[in-house]
Amino acid sequence: MAKLENDMIRWGRLLFERRLISGWGGNLSCRTGKNNFLITGQHAPLAFLTPRDLVRLNSDGKPVRKQQSASSETPMHMAVYSGTDAQAIVHVHPPMVLAFSLTHESFVPVSFEEKYTIGEVPIIAQDTPTVTKPEKVVEALRYHPVAIIKGHGTVAIGKTFQEAFLLTDLLEEAVHCQFFKAGIATSREPASQPAKQERVAADGKRYQLFSKEHMTALVESANGDQDFRKFGDDTSLTTALTLHLEESNTAWTVKFVSGEITELNQQSDGDFLISGQAEWWNAVFSNKIYAFLATQQGKLKLKRGELAELSRWYKPFQRAFALWQTIPIQ
């Protein structure tokens, strides 16, 4: 417990030094066991934490020592632990992100690092000083490692405080760069982000995930797209990619030659094999999470091949998944 307390004290100070928090704002928490937690106390300044400012919680989110008062955001922290696999939570008020949230609906990543690490970050509406309806925060954090609360701050999760800290810091710097590029007064959603439009199946129905009809539609959409074929040709996209659905043990292998899909079969012998549960494949095909980000986070698992090798075809694959996300699924 002493090590966890020291870690929390250290990360609180670093958050303050990086100006990701000021005054008495923000709160930190972590799991200390299967059903036990440690959280900063009410009005505890993160820059100057001591062991007395840290509160042990039981499985109900109640202080083990009744004379202590936990952070007012404790219900949100408990909801996040219940709904995600978070081991540590960092909730702070980064000034750049806070200002950005007032004029945007989401953060759209620009750099490759942002796309790999945080993806598109939703901005959640809120009209109370504390998070009284954590459901939307939990939903966002199931698909993204960090979420933005409008006019309030960020919530980042990770296996450690370091991971949650780095996600928060990266997001603040990314927003800073967007402000620097566009100017705070004129910053708006990137004009190059078109509204998502779904293709409608001929019979008006949605495709069953990983059905033959669904996979055929994916192939046709890619081969019929001039940009995908150009990007694939430019990067010499020649490989075989297997997509695997865990629940039904369904596998499809898509073979690419010079940027064109030349074969689709139900084998599992691709150079690369990506496997995942239906929840995460649905999230990818519904544009809730980027495929590369889902793989980076372990929601989808690269069971064959190396991500670094796969990433050399990032541009055509990104285009393919953007097309595939327009195809309606059940």
Give the role of each language-model region.
Residues M1-E213, D271-L273, S286-I289, Q297-K301, ...:
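Glycine-rich flexible loops
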Residues Q193-Q330:
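Feature captures hydrophobic
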